[in-house]
C-alpha cells in the first residue's frame, strides 16, 4: 500500500470514482494561477491588437469567458467541489505569434482552486480560438499548465 500522500483521493478501495470528503478540513486562503498560449499567424495577431476582427473585442470576451468558466468548473469537471470563489483575474500578453494567458483564482475554503484556474485558462484560450478561427485555421492552443498554487495542507507550490 502506498503512503497516504501517494494515494489517489478520488477513488475508493475498489477503484470506483468518489468525491473527496473535505468536510473536516480547515478553511484557509488558497490561490492558483494557470497559464497557456494561443498561437496564430502574424496577420491575425495584428487584427486582434487593432480590434479589427468581425466578432469584436476578442480579449474582452475571452476574459469574461474565463471568469465564467472558473465559476462553473464543478459543473464541467465531475469530481470538483462547488466553491465560493472570491477572485478571478484573466490577463494577456500579446506577443509576435501568440497570446499568453494568465488566470488567477482565489478562495477561502477547504479545497484548492487549481482546477478553476486551469478551466479559466482553457476557456479563455478556446474563446480566442473561436473568435479568430474564421480568419486563421492554423491556430493552436498550447502549454496550458498550473504555474503556482498557495495554501492548503500541501502548502505552496511554484513551477520552476
State where each predicted segment sits:
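C-terminal binding/interaction regions
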Residues: 2-59, 64-79, 86-160
Amino acid at each position: 500500500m502506498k503512503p497516504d500522500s501517494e494515494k489517489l483521493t478520488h477513488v475508493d478501495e475498489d477503484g470506483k470514482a468518489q468525491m473527496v470528503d473535505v468536510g473536516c478540513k480547515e478553511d484557509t486562503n488558497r490561490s492558483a494561477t494557470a497559464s497557456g498560449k494561443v498561437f496564430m499567424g502574424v496577420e491575425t495577431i495584428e487584427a486582434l491588437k487593432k480590434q479589427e476582427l468581425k466578432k469584436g473585442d476578442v480579449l474582452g470576451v475571452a476574459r469574461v469567458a474565463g471568469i465564467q468558466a472558473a465559476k462553473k468548473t464543478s459543473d464541467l469537471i465531475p469530481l470538483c467541489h462547488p466553491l465560493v470563489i472570491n477572485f478571478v483575474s484573466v490577463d494577456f500578453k500579446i506577443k509576435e505569434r501568440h497570446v499568453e494567458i494568465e488566470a488567477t483564482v482565489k478562495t477561502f475554503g477547504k479545497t484548492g482552486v487549481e482546477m478553476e484556474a486551469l478551466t479559466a485558462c482553457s476557456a479563455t484560450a478556446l474563446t480566442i480560438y473561436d473568435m479568430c478561427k474564421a480568419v486563421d485555421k492554423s491556430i493552436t492552443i498550447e502549454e496550458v499548465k498550473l504555474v503556482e498554487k498557495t495554501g492548503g495542507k500541501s502548502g505552496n507550490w511554484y513551477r520552476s
